Amino acid sequence: MKSLIIDNYDSYTYNLFQLIGKVSGIEPLVIKNDEMTYDEILNLDFDNVIISPGPGSPDKAKDFGVCREIIEKLDKPILGICLGHQGIYYYHGGEVVRAKEPMHGRQSPVIHNGKGIFKGIKNNFIVTRYHSLTCEDKELDDIKIDARTSDGIVMGISHKTKPIYGLQFHPESIASDCGEELIKNFINITRDFYNKNQLAYEIIDKDFDTGNLYEMLYEYDDKTLWLDSSKVEEGLSRFSIFGLQGEKRGHTIKYDVNNKIVEKTFVNSDKKEVFEENIFYYLKANRPRCEYDENLPFDFQLGYIGYFGYELKKDTENVVNKYSYSYPDAYLKYCDRALVYDHMEGKLYLLSYKDDLEWKEDIKNLLNKEIIINKEETRRDFPKLKFVKDKKTYTEDILKIKDLIRAGETYEVCLTNRLDIFDKIDGKNYYMELRDKSPGQYSAFLPLDELKIASSSMERFLRVDKNKIVSTKPIKGTIKRGESKEEDERLIEELRSEEKTMSENLMIVDLLRNDLGKFCEIGSVEVPKLMDVETYKTLHQLVTTVSGKIKDDVDIIEVLEKTFPGGSMTGAPKKRTLEIIDELETYPRGVYSGTIGYISNNSTMDFNIVIRTALIEEDKATIGVGGAIILLSDEEEEFDEIVLKAKGSLLALQSYYNNFDEIDIEGSKN
């Protein structure tokens, strides 16, 4: 267990350094309280924090520096000593006052409750004190008092639910008893903090239809999240993940990018926590962590599932949002329970924490039930469909982009349009049809409050595996399927050899190589597959793979932050092109063009690019479509391509409406 000591300019800090290093066997890190920002500290490698003694008062920024943010934000074990102890009490709402008399280099016996950091410590042990201030003898909403002197001066405190402890005395003093034992207890508390998050899993060796499996889980909990390998391909999409939330640890993170507000809510609770910070900084500091379980054949071992919306470009690329999204800009659910299905081996894994096992019996009973699926029977007339930008406006935008390319403002712009469907659509039923009619390797169904997200994406944005290898699979270049095998082969060859398609793909590949180069080891960024053709029900597409080895000191959240939004949905150069997109498009993209996936406790992650996705609200649904515009683009062909892509997503509605073959999209004709 590696400790970080925040030095409040005290003369005894390196006595603490020696004591902690001796007990833990690992040399601690030491930084001054004004040496680094909180965000910079998050990039350091440490397991717990010791806030040192020091002169002054915790309410003064010059005395306490970054320690306040550590106390208020960090989700790791914290031990405050003397000034650090007072800061913990003060920033949880307590009063720090002058002591009856200053105590410097003086000794006292301590009486304690034998719990937490005092576990196994004899009572009336002798400590050395150096303080003029003291915490009031009063318990707070979140803080309890664990130890006092015989005359009632507070000597030890702890948080009621978090691993945060304070000691008024100096355990590192040569004349203090039990210093090593106290530090050993804190190290054990740190170890328990990480160990309590250990994974428990059970394997059911049985084939399941994952569609039927989700129907059962949805009946059990209609908030169940589904990362669905609806198109199974070895090495790409072998596992499907079903995420659920328990009351003990389940929580939801929503983020408002324009106001930089992170909101954390809890399962079956009115409790809410609000943080005024960037979502990426929040996750670096607060996401749960655990070791990778090598016995499992997949990377997701509990963690966050959800989306990051396109408008997060304000944080990642410093591009002001011209339009604001009406739903959260990021929405993550912490899934402390999950089912993972191995499509290759025909095995179902039930995952949870070791202290949360009872729910699995409910699931196993559920799996033994016969599922009855009630499909929508009544067919009705096709609803009104409308492009936000009609053909005339969209093609005019393409001409504007070409002028900007000629002027040297950009190389390539991913221009998008939005198809609005004006009808009440059942989100789950729509997704079940979508995965059947138009499957994708990186599909998902996320029922999130008023918004249901049904995605059949076949494009991977980012994957980080257990070896810190990052990979991305941009798609650029699309052509329709042929009527015959011979025509199909001809179209594939046309796609491979067309100069425009190759240009589109190369620009994005080089952009993503650049993005990965920001945090990968020198020489490790490679392109193992360049412009492979992948075939789907309605079209062929060109797909490239780019990969690299992440530097040891880079957190996976930084990987996401430094590559978002995905280059295949922006164009290049990225920042200038994002500004151009905001001038041309008249609405926020929201979830579309963002990313859906997971951040696992074990520091792996896997995210798609949000394409082929319906965003379903109460009385309408929207489908985003788009394409890369370069100088070689033909306006008519580009518009035909987005109509083709839209119809791929509309296939899911085929079972519910009459006259499907006569679909008329308002705005799709001159």
Annotate each language-model stretch with its function.
Residues 6-7, 169, 227, 509:
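Active-site flanking residues adjacent to catalytic metal/cofactor-binding acidic residues
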Residues 195-670:
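Extended alpha-helical targeting/anchoring segments
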Residues 28-30, 96, 145:
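Generic structural signal for residues in well-ordered beta-strands
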Residues 22-24, 30-32, 37, 48-51, ...:
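A generic "structured core" feature
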Residues 43-120, 124, 183:
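Cysteine-nucleophile active-site neighborhood
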Residues 114-162, 594:
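Catalytic beta-strand/loop cores that center a nucleophilic Ser/Cys/Thr
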Residues 171-195:
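Acyltransferase
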